[in-house]
Amino acid sequence: MKGTPSFGKMNKSHTHIRCRRCGRNAYNVSKHYCAACGFGRTKKIRRYSWQNKKVNGVRIR
């Protein structure tokens, strides 16, 4: 089967699994890298100033 009926089967498997470096559910299984920390793509941990937020809404450094 191809076309529109096949698109409904694309949400069965998990796109992201738990990353073994940062522990977040952001490791892309098909692309073999973590969207959160960059594991599998770079040795340096991917980190930006806008990335982390505390519960009360304040950014942490």
UniProtKB/Swiss-Prot annotation:
Keyword check for Disulfide bond: no
Gene3D superfamilies, A to Z: 2.20.25.30
Binding-site list for Zn(2+): C19, C22, C34, C37
Pfam families, alphabetized: Ribosomal_L37e (PF01907)
PROSITE patterns assigned to the protein according to its UniProt record, in alphabetical order: RIBOSOMAL_L37E (PS01077)
Keyword list, A-Z: Metal-binding, Ribonucleoprotein, Ribosomal protein, RNA-binding, rRNA-binding, Zinc, Zinc-finger
InterPro entries in the cross-refs: Ribosomal_eL37, Ribosomal_eL37/eL43, Ribosomal_eL37_CS, Ribosomal_zn-bd
Gene Ontology CC, one term: cytosolic large ribosomal subunit
GO molecular function, one term: zinc ion binding
Gene Ontology terms describing biological process: translation
Cystines in this chain: none
Job of this protein: Binds to the 23S rRNA.
Family, similarity comment: Belongs to the eukaryotic ribosomal protein eL37 family.
Protein name: Large ribosomal subunit protein eL37
